[in-house]
Amino acid sequence: SSLWLHMGAWGPRRVSTDDTAIVSAPFKTVNNDYSLLDASDLVFIDAPGTGFSRIIDKEMGGSGDPKEFYGSDEDAMAFADFITQFLNTFNLWNSPKYLFGESYGTYRSAALSYILEMGKGVGLNGVIMLSQILSWDNIADLAQANPGMDLPYQLALPSLAAAAWYHHKLPDQPEKLDPLLREVEEFSMGEYAMALSKGSTLDSASSAKILQRLHKYTGLPETYIRKANFRISGPLFEQNLLANNYKVVGRLDTRFTGYSMDPLGKQPDFDPLEAAIFSVFIASANNYIRSTLRFGQDMTYHPFGEGVGGNWDFRHRTPGMPHEIVGNVMPDLARAMSYNPRLKVMLNMGYFDLATPYYEGIYEMQHLPMDPALQKNISYAFYKSGHMVYLNVPSLKEMHDNVAKFIADTH
């Protein structure tokens, strides 16, 4: 649902957060000094089956079928239909228009930009992304299930280094983060990429050199790195960085920590960020909607898709391709930007995010299949926060100012 952006970032009221602190009920909401209402009107759309939206199926007297909505392409089309109907209803066709997506919402926004621009005649001024993922092949969580595809390990490594730096686990702890990240980025796409490409033919001298560098950048023991075959996935890192303290670090935000439920396990049983903030947001949103807005008294607000689970169809028909593939909307965004060369794109990424590592976002943007001249239409902003950048209030203020300027500069 949209409650995270609504109650965490851009709405007129927001959940009071103290960065990584864990709080207990009663939770507080405060006036949001960083709402984007000073820069734009805001329309929060809950995907079908989330929030108060319901799919009216036969049991409810309708003819709706979850299969019509629970899929990458189906979801994007539902959003496109809603947006065009909204423009009709409120006569907003001539207004500047922007998409803002967070996490999966960035994937949706890329697909949606193509549908709106080339299928619906809706000209967009900008697409704003927070914590981007446009290709599932690049995700650090799933790397072990896709042997031979080593790119996710390279793209995640700078974020692993950021986490180890934050928790003071680096053997040679630098004072500043940014120079470290530039060094790791260069290593990831250079020596590390070359070593991984050699697979089982990597010689012992090169192995020792790569092993030493990975230990330097992650703080993990060399024996563990060797057992992992130099390929450190997100879950393995989250489980092992603070293993000596019987703790795990967050996936969505590696600054968050929690007690390990299975110290001998391969991956954490839960995400400490989820444990820290999900109940806070859900309780606060329900209280605000029902007490202040006086809406939904007899309804259940679903923060996540009710009954979606494993029923989501990740297949996507890439523009210009005859067959569906699983999960890559980079061509969609590239075609939208090529069709409308005035369309601007903004990326906002947190350094401590392992769900969608910041360098993966950079890589995807730099590899969009379009004329390189259009790269000038892409801008980047990075924050010392995680997947939900807005949990860190200084980062929220910084992101507000960056996004507000982007909007002002593009209409």
Predicted regions and their residues:
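A catalytic-pocket lid/entrance helix-loop region that shapes and gates access to the active site
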Residues: 8-17, 117-219
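Alpha/beta-hydrolase active-site loop
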Residues: 47, 67-88
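Alpha/beta-hydrolase fold nucleophile elbow
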Residues: 92-104
